[in-house]
């Protein structure tokens, strides 16, 4: 089975970005995407990992990669942010537990400086997990995620190639929303790159995935707007179980 883990809401940019091989000039690190703290502004870096992560960013280290070919700045990694994904939690855990087998998950709040609309929130919950073991592969990851959605009763889920700075190969799972005639991204997934795992001393493949809980519920409960979860509509709340049951047994 899986073990549940938790992590801090206020996080070092080091864990939120740098340890995940996300370059310091990446657009996601800009203030229009990420909430940075004014006070306190900086935190304490894990000194045993700083030089290893720095080398991977600048030259690729001994991974065979060329890195990002820029001058990595300690002061950027020291900044404190409201975590933008719970991958910061799983990468912290992986740094402390580099040996297999590992099967952990997290369901927790994250924050993004985004324009709010029918499928985006500035504060929401993310479902996150990793599996690390000898011989695991991308096919195992696809099977795990497919089984997860199947047991929830979601139909019309498919996988398509994607890109994330910290996984390769990468994919996303999407579900078709008939009422909106569109595909909605549910989860991003992939295998952690060597530039992520090697500085942590991890020697085996790590399957990783993460996606919004509210988006999953949006698909499960036939909602038109993700903001409905925070409207406190008692009539809708009382009817949730019926909506889900109808969808689970194929009545919708």
Predicted regions and their residues:
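TRNA-recognition modules of translation machinery and tRNA-sensing kinases, especially anticodon-binding
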Residues: 1-252
